[in-house]
Amino acid sequence: PGTANNPSYKATGISVVLHPSSPHIPSMHFNTRYLQTEQEWFGGGIDITPCLPYDDEKNYHSSLNEMCNKFNKSYYSEYKKWCDDYFYLPHRKELRGIGGIFFDYLHSDDWGKDFEFVQAVGSFFHNYSLFVINKLKEKSWNDQEKNIQLLKRSRYAEFNLLHDRGTRFGLETGGNIDAILMSMPPLAKWE
């Protein structure tokens, strides 16, 4: 948007992707960005991809809902649906993980409030990821659980290479390839 008369743009963002060694700790992704053309907007999101049964899913979603409601009562349901639709692998007919929120083109009449929301998304990710890591980091795993993790990570890689807008944007605009592909899991397996 906003490039019809002038194709130049400015973009900045923060992306964090965690692919823990432990198959009990889900892969976690956080991204926020600000883009400026003749228009300006924020985007971003949080999603997690457990490999094994995950007993905190309900708490995760209710906490995200609570955070979103501080800014706009419609954000959670709207952004959760966007996340579920976005992180879907059509060739596998499955979701990449258990979702979260995903938003783009956030530009209300209050830039400061929009920025506060983006900051809250970052704070939520920081606090939630520490909670999960500290809760599960000592839990042991076996070879079968590690194998399940590697298979689940193959879905993560497939999504990023085939469908991710950020990956495509970075590759199409001549970005740093190593930085663009940093979100890939370090190991994955296909059967």
Walk through the language-model features, giving the residues of each.
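A domain-level signal for the structural core that forms small-molecule/cofactor-binding pockets
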Residues: 1-191
